[in-house]
Swiss-Prot record:
Binds and hydrolyzes ATP via the two cytoplasmic ABC transporter nucleotide-binding domains. The two ATP-binding domains interact with each other, forming a head-to-tail dimer. Normal ATPase activity requires interaction between the two domains. The first ABC transporter nucleotide-binding domain has no ATPase activity by itself. Its EC number is 5.6.1.6. This is Cystic fibrosis transmembrane conductance regulator. It comes from Ovis aries (Sheep). The lineage of its organism: Eukaryota, Metazoa, Chordata, Craniata, Vertebrata. It comes from the Eukaryota. It is found in: Apical cell membrane; Early endosome membrane; Cell membrane; Recycling endosome membrane. There is a cross-link at residue 687 (Glycyl lysine isopeptide (Lys-Gly) (interchain with G-Cter in ubiquitin)).
Amino acid sequence: MQRSPLEKASVVSKLFFSWTRPILKKGYRQRLELSDIYHISSSDSADNLSEKLEREWDRELASKKNPKLINALRRCFFWRFMFYGIILYLGEVTKAVQPLLLGRIIASYDPDNKVERSIAIYLGIGLCLLFIVRTLLLHPAIFGLHHIGMQMRIAMFSLIYKKTLKLSSRVLDKISIGQLVSLLSNNLNKFDEGLALAHFVWIAPLQVTLLMGLLWDLLQAFTFCGLAFLVVLALLQAGLGKMMMKYRDQRAGKINERLVITSEMIENIQSVKAYCWEEAMEKIIENLRQTELKLTRKAAYVRYLNSSAFFFSGFFVVFLSVLPYALLKGIILRKIFTTISFCIVLRMAVTRQFPWAVQTWYDSLGAINKIQDFLQKQEYKTLEYNLTTTDVVMENVTAFWEEGFSKLFEKAKENNNNRKISNCDTSLFFSNLLLGTPVLKDISFKIERGQLLAVAGSTGAGKTSLLMMIMGELEPSEGKIKHSGRISFCSQYSWIMPGTIKDNIIFGVSYDEYRYRSVIKACQLEEDISKFSEKDNIVLGEGGITLSGGQRARISLARAVYKDADLYLLDSPFGYLDVLTEKEIFESCVCKLMANKTRILVTSKMEHLKKADKILILHEGSVYFYGTFSELQNQRPDFSSKLMGCDTFDQFTAERRNSIITETLRRFSLEGDTSVSWNETKKPSFKQTGEFGEKRKNSILNSINSIRKFSVVQKTSLQMNGIDGASDEPLERRLSLVPHSEPGEGILPRSNAVNSGPTFLGGRRQSVLNLMTCSSVNQGQSIHRKTATSTRKMSLAPQASLAEIDIYSRRLSQDTGLEISEEINEEDLRDCFFDDVENIPAVTTWNTYLRYITVHKSLMFVLIWCLVVFLVEVAASLVVLCLFPKILLQDKGNSTKNASNSYAVIITSTSSYYIFYIYVGVADTLLALGLFRGLPLVHTLITVSKTLHHKMLQSVLQAPMSTLNTLKTGGILNRFSKDIAVLDDLLPLTIFDFIQLLLIVIGAVVVVSVLQPYIFLATVPVIAAFILLRGYFLHTSQQLKQLESEGRSPIFTHLVTSLKGLWTLRAFGRQPYFETLFHKALNLHTANWFLYLSTLRWFQMRIEMIFVIFFIAVTFISILTTGEGEGRVGIILTLAMNIMGTLQWAVNSSIDVDSLMRSVSRVFKFIDMPTEDGKPNNSFRPSKDSQPSKVMIIENQHVKKDDIWPSGGQMTVKDLTAKYIDGGNAILENISFSISPGQRVGLLGRTGSGKSTLLLAFLRLLNTKGEIQIDGVSWDSITLQQWRKAFGVIPQKVFIFSGTFRKNLDPYEQWSDQEIWKVADEVGLRSVIEQFPGKLDFVLVDGGCVLSHGHKQLMCLARSVLSKAKILLLDEPSAHLDPITYQIIRRTLKQAFADCTVILSEHRIEAMLECQRFLVIEENKVRQYDSIQRMLSEKSLFRQAISPADRLKLLPHRNSSRQRSRANIAALKEETEEEVQETKL
């Protein structure tokens, strides 16, 4: 960034904004980069502004019982705000004085008024000077108010962020991300946009008073006729606005539904393609779009009428003011033209300025109150522990996440009992819900310095809550805690901050090279880092999305280990690691590197418990066991089945299996208002979430997608509740910290299962606390793997043993503190946060306009029709001009002596009738023609939007994954949300306004030129100057706007990133650093925004300066040209004076149109994406010579066996190479192997080795080379749809879209209910579905939030069974499954897919034991492909990964092979006898 010229600019340069010329010149000549932007002044920096407001707010808090944020803002900004308001008022006063001089100039043309004639030239000079003064006053005032609004926004942005970092976890559990984003975007943007209008709340009444006084002098009491009409018009516009909001509110729900489905489709586009659901998803979305567009059209028609009312009101204001006076008393022309000019100013004040000002104050005060409430919420308090460096002690500790919740629970229970609920097992409900129970009860333990405490337990037992209490995030209600204050923490779900790998590991602690390298080695990160071109200095953005889940987990662990602390809290740090890597890291890092440190490890692995010094097992918040491992074996032999739910599926009753559904549904009913009767609550509780969650329309932010979707929250018209709404819904709050996707999920659900869904979903919100505890398991599968897939290879060879040394003994002198860098490179910040720069020209090309016009054939005809109507209007005006002088001359000859003696031209009663008829006739004609012109235009433009959405949706669904992998999910969603909203809402009305204003200006110029041809000579250069100036400015402004838009994203990204890692931030004490980073992001945005405001004001001022020159020319041509009549001069000067505002408005509208057309350019860019196979709408039509001749896929019908393909499921893979993007590095190279029909093959490899990639390659979802044959049919001989239908898929990322059970299982409606129920029986889903009202017609929302992860996996399994596929692909199907669902899947695979080929990628050893062959992938290639017997007998990855106990389980498999002798079996048995108890909890 460069030094700003503003620092050394002179007063004149600042007044005329000339200091912006260098950036305007550079932007016109070349593309602007971030380095071209100017540094902001110190007065605009977030640090100074936040410190100033924070100081005043603290003063307000300290001095008053009811602190008001507006008082703090007043003390910071009031005097400057008032100063610019007074200047603005003086500029507006000049508009009221101008018509007075105009009237004097017109009066000077009266032959009897020679005195006035002599000073006409001076009157003209005075009129021109008024325009110059107005220009010099208004623009600095408007810019100053915009500047103050920007500063207020920055200060409050920072204040909200600082408060967010201080909020207690209890408060965070009650606030959704959508509410925070709403505070930072929808609310605070009002200050930027509206502060310039705020002063009109007092300026407009003063202006109206002054104008009414001047009009009284002209028309006396008849003045109030026009004012009354304007007041009625303002009320009418308010009514139209209310009607428009009604339609928009109705439409918002439809937009929600469409965006929900679209978001789910985009997030799961791989699954959509794998299931061949493209046509089904397109049909669902288009049906929703149709309903949405009906309401869009209604809202657009109302908006059009509202906008048109302003344009056409000018006729009637003058008509109602002048006509009564003229009929009774007669009127001179001077009064007519003066009245017209006064009425134009009056109309603007009454119908635009004052209503806008009132709305601005209403919105701003509402936003300030919301922020004020937020700033007074409870803060996180660091607990005062009894500090010690020798041990950690808990004595009889009990804790609640929600204080006072037991009373609320009992009240709800009593209310429900009083209602005598029928057909509901209330005892089961309340026994499972456990709302009023503490999360931890009577916890006591003690560990000495240097010991390892392993904490185990079932899902929701309170393991994470225990760590939170030690960290101070959860305040104990009873008991004592004693430990050292120096804590290091590793979260269960890895959190990566924007920055380099080194920054993430060091995390502000002083850099020690030896310690750093030791930690890198212990956490198995050496080889990963070596694969990156920039090594550990590679910048990671968006939560480390370029890394695999295992890499993120190891970086998070390395961060915790690097810090020198007294107590290390490790919350399930090995969740995403393969068995071998986990084993090595546990040994080298936890057991050796940290041997002298006190460690608390949350785990579910028996081998970890065996090596722990002490074991603490929790169950339902209580201590189930505390002691050593040997004591555990002796005292609690049943602990495995008790805690982990390992009983077999058949031993559970149907009631217990279905308890998760029963509890979830009834919890929804309980969450309603307790004052509502049960019947009123129950009925909506089973329909769409939005129906029973009217209070909870605020957004739900998915932990993965929230960062990418803020443009949706900011730009769409969706409604959000404020922060204050959260306090009204105590029953909605979550109690447990453990998300539903935790490995080893228990039988009974948590009462707060985390909902995942996009930003704009209605219904149950996800709190910030849920966001912090959400899994990011799918982040590594994002589209950004294109940049990291080649680096995710990991060595299969174990690392060398780490020397048993104490790396923490090498403490540097400054190591006790945190080293916080104040210097943050803006370029690095851009790498961390910014989206890819769009490859769109700075100015919309003519080709885009032409293509837009030709999208729908009717648009061209409508534009021609508009031109015809305009010509008719101009012709009508010229006819009036021709008739007008004749009427006046005729009347002049017939006038009485008294009349002729007073003024030369007087309109008598007779001529008034003629003028009345002409005036009203022209007004009616223009009004009718305007309606005929505008309504078809708006209607057609919405039709064009409909067509573009349809084409874009088709293009995305048909695009190859290699193209979609290069796009960010949020970017795709923005096209369907923000850009389509622009095409639907903003563009039609903006185009209408531009065309209307352009035609008004052209018509006025034509009339003036006809009346005085000399003026046409001045008009030509003025028009040329406008066109050149617009083109010059547009290049720079659009680039600055784009940079500003890109600069906004890091602010919200940083907010969510901070929230997701808030516990880590507090544990490491990194809040100051993150505040600094947030301020840097704010400053970066401010630099772009301030420069955009400055250049915009430069442009606006130049427009007015050109017009002032034009008006001076018109004025003096009219005055100096002899022979002009009074009426002609009046028309010329009135039109010329009032062209100014219209012309400026028209030029601004043209810039707005160009800016909005960038959305059209982006949509066209998506429409032009290539299609899969380069052929849109592929359909398979085999030629006569194609072989085999009877190739087909089973779809709806049962066919003869001779016609079925595939029939056996044999696969042959030859030289398969796969890439994620065109031109990218190969992820898999030269893969060749074959699979026999009905065989089960397991895929083995380290984390990130390419197992999931291989499954995607089978489905042709990647850029692939080579050949695969299924039962002799090559994938090149049939279409993609046919090829993919040969596979059944259970993806790692489960896809449940918003719709009924039936739609989710059978979106094409191919199967009967009997078939679906039969399959539901097979996979164990019948009892689940039957619990819901409507059964198969029950509508699932929020990604199936009422279903457990296991049930969602069963849904995928049911889809595969329905597809009758012969080849089944399973990608980590047991990840995050509870044992019950896992047993169901294993049973279904054995029964329903007994004769199918199964390819399985799995970390769970038990599942792999059922495979006949294994494919080992290492370094992008097949390293080994063999049977289970050979894999166990050789040194292989499989043998390293499998435990001796699991090898013992494989004895039956090996014994079945006749090639193995009993001696080998005996040797294996002897080898594993000692470790036979080593199993997974």
